[in-house]
Amino acid sequence: MNTPTTTSVIIIDDHPLFRKGVSQLIALNDQLHLIGEASSGEEGLELARALEPDLILLDLNMKGMSGIETLRALRDADLAARILILTVSDAADDLVAAIRAGADGYLLKDMEPEELLARIVEAMRGRIVISESL
């Protein structure tokens, strides 16, 4: 069981290497606890319903169910999780679509690892987090 100061996290991303890197990064922060990984939106939705994480890191561009479709489904499932989009897309339209669909943040995958961890902590404090380069 997680203590109140620990944030449970799942990663939904179709790239195994990226999931592995982010999971190793999360392991470096005592406040974060990775409880699951999914390689598709469909799998991620199932996992989120079953595990009810505090935070979901969600890729935008995935095969099958897109990140926006997954985000909408997660919000429709009435999960309390904070959801951060973690993507390579710096397109303004994608950012706007994600925020409108209920994202709590929009972060670019090219950010420094320490910055990503700092933004995750900010998001868990209730802030909307968006990459500075946007």
Q: Can you say where each PLM-predicted feature lies in the sequence?
A:
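Short hydrophobic/Thr-rich beta-strand motif most characteristic of the beta2 strand and flanking loop
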Residues: Q31-S39, L47
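Short amphipathic alpha-helix used as the core "switch/output" element in two-component signaling
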Residues: E46, I68-L79
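Short, flexible helix-to-coil linker/hinge segments that flank and couple to helix-turn-helix
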Residues: D93-R100, G105-L134
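Conserved acidic segment of CheY-like receiver
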Residues: T5-F18, V22-I26
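Active-site beta3 strand of CheY-like receiver
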Residues: L51-L57
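Acidic catalytic/metal-coordinating carboxylates
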Residues: S40-E43, M65-E69
